[in-house]
Amino acid sequence: MDKTQLILLGLPIFLLCSDLFNLFTPPPPKSQHQSPPSISETLDFPAQKSTGVGYGNTVEINFCISCSYKGTAVSMKKMLESVFPGLDVVLANYPAPAPKRILAKVVPVAQVGVIGLIMGGEQIFPMIGIAQPPAWYHSLRANRFGSMASTWLLGNFLQSFLQSSGAFEVSCNGELVFSKLKEGRFPGEIELRDLISGTMTKPFVTGSY
């Protein structure tokens, strides 16, 4: 086995092991920083925040992070905060359904199984009672480097698909005002502004900002 073949073999295995490590490793505990003691004093101007037309209202934008919707969510957040001063806009991930998330965790295991079968099938098949490996195994074995690379790429694509929810859900004060899952599209800025205005506890008046 020459140097090029070793690289082609090692790269997919390294990336696959990296995916498995990131998937099953729990996130590190958040370090608790000691905040310096705050000096409590009364200021003359904090009441300005309460004069904003959006003060006291909360908008939640739950979107699919793995679908690259973050840019759209941030743009909508900035627009709403500029139109409704004082409005609290919260961005959060909208996860895929539980069955899809479970299948997404199975994919890396299947990738390891397929790659292991390609590399050591001649020993694995007799262990499970199959004396002669099937014809499809010989086809994969004949081009084992391409087969392993394809297994890794297709597995990553499938895992990304299973982790995607395709959601862009907007709620105002706990009430759903727009759902991409139902509408099949993103909301327009003017449309979203009007939806939020009709749901706020302090109605938005044109020209009041």
Swiss-Prot record:
Statement: the UniProt record of this protein carries the keyword Zinc-finger: no
Residues of the signal peptide: 1-22
InterPro entries, per database record: Selenoprotein_Rdx-typ, Selenoprotein_T, Thioredoxin-like_sf
Disulfide bond sites: 64-67
A Pfam cross-reference name: Rdx
Keywords: Disulfide bond, Redox-active center, Signal
Family the entry assigns: Belongs to the SelWTH family. SELT subfamily.
Entry protein name: SelT-like protein
